[in-house]
A protein has these predicted regions:
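Strand-loop microenvironment adjacent to phosphate/nucleotide-handling motifs in alpha/beta enzyme folds
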Residues: 31-253
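Conserved Rossmann-fold NAD(P)-dependent oxidoreductase catalytic core, especially the SDR/UDP-sugar
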Residues: 1-26, 31, 37
Length: 253
């Protein structure tokens, strides 16, 4: 049997809770797959595979149906930022590639898909207005939402890819995690959700996914605290190694 988890490009260097939750799911699924492969070398077991891609055209909550409704209602068509871009796939493309990745995966892989060139959302809005024939409809910029990026990434800067036999499917080489450690941290996170303390919950998420840096959000203060702790730690390390402190000071002369 195979289990295919659907992830998103928002899991890469996440800037909001949704993207981070997807990255946590990736980490859990991949660490579980690794554990099962080590424990069941000569037995059958469920293979856990992850697929990571961008926006699916026409799916529930996607930008196309929203723009279509706004145009039908006479506008305005709302775009968050004039420079925002996104990767898109059609529903048939997404289904086909997910099934293909599920078929080729043996367990633990994170598959990413070649989605071509990203699309500027403003250009998409203009084209839809033009095709509708309702050129009087205006476009309104509403500003980036909490945790929203101008562009999404399919890979972290530390990640690399391996090619597969399919020219549109690649494997992301990501950091490996110990399953028991991940399980312990996720259990703590789940238990903490019962407190409804959003700062504490997001703080634990940031421990699991250190590259989760909040953007346009009240959770940014957690990142500032982490930066101060890192600075304090670095200072302490230098005091523990005075020769390094002396060397750094001499380099300034």
């Amino acid at each position: 049997e195979k289990f295919v988890m659907i992830s998103t490009d928002k899991a890469v260097n996440p800037t909001n809770v949704m993207g981070c939750s997807k990255r946590i799911a990736e980490i859990y699924v991949q660490s579980l797959a690794r554990k099962l492969s080590l424990e069941n070398k000569n037995k059958k077991y469920t293979s856990f595979i992850t697929t990571r891609f961008g926006n699916v055209l026409g799916s529930n909550g996607s930008v196309i149906p929203r723009f279509r409704k706004q145009i039908t209602d006479g506008g305005p068509v709302t775009v968050t930022h004039p420079e925002i871009i996104r990767y898109f796939m059609t529903i048939p493309e997404a289904c086909k590639l997910v099934l293909e990745a599920g078929g080729m995966g043996s367990g633990g892989e994170i598959y990413i898909f070649d989605m071509g060139e990203p699309v500027k959302i403003l250009d998409l809005a203009k084209r839809m207005i033009k095709l509708s024939g309702r050129t009087e409809v205006k476009i309104e910029f509403t500003g980036l939402r909490h945790g929203e990026k101008l562009y999404e990434e399919l890979l972290n800067v530390k990640e690399q890819t391996e090619m597969t036999y399919h020219d549109k499917i690649m494997i992301a080489n990501v950091r490996q995690y110990d399953y028991e450690t991940v399980k312990e941290m996720i259990t703590e996170l789940v238990n903490t959700t019962q407190s409804y303390d959003s700062m504490k919950i997001v703080g634990l998420m940031k421990e699991l996914v250190p590259e989760f840096i909040s953007k346009n959000s009240l959770f940014e203060e957690l990142d500032h605290k982490n930066e101060k702790q890192e600075d304090h730690k670095s200072c302490g390390e230098l005091l523990d190694h005075p020769s390094e402190l002396k060397r750094d000071a001499s380099s300034l002369n």
